[in-house]
Amino acid sequence: MKNILFVVFISMIFLFVCCNTTTNKNIIETEISDFDKILDSFQVNGSILIYDNDKNTFYSNDFDWAKNGKLPASTFKIPNSIIAVELGIIENDTTILKWNGEQRKMDIWEKDLSFKDAFRISCVPCYQEIARKIGTIKMKEYLEKFEYKNMIFDSLTIDNFWLEGNSKISQKQQIDFLRKAEFNLQMQQNSD
């Protein structure tokens, strides 16, 4: 779990060029128009949102977009992984997730994968199986505990609600979740 959170937080580190800054409830929001260039280079509409914990500052090209809920998609691997580890479904990053031999959307998913590799290559069928093992009741219980809100699912959609349907989470809510997860991990490390 520590490896997963470390990868997530490392991927959020950037060098910033400040442009337009506003303050809201001691949180600073700084607009970075250069982020639009990054998105434009990939021909993608959206926003980039980065949080600097030391400066209590958010950086984005579009704060309205960043506060609007979207399907969590691949980012749901993070809470899904934490829940699986907490419940003992996954022991560690070397736990093997067996391929059932069925054809998958991507060839790279068509083999047994370590948990670490399944995370790295975003193996959707692996995470669908993990979600089924977690089950509806435990998934709801943990998401409520994490304050990971607006996930809409039942026993029929337990393995795809983060990919399709009406579940929504904003980039801002995602960062709030990661901040809480980091804090809780630090608290656990300090108590060990």
Listing of model-derived features with the role each one plays in the protein:
Residues G69-D93, A118:
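Active-site SXXK
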Residues E86-G101, M187-D192:
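Short, well-structured active-site flanking segments
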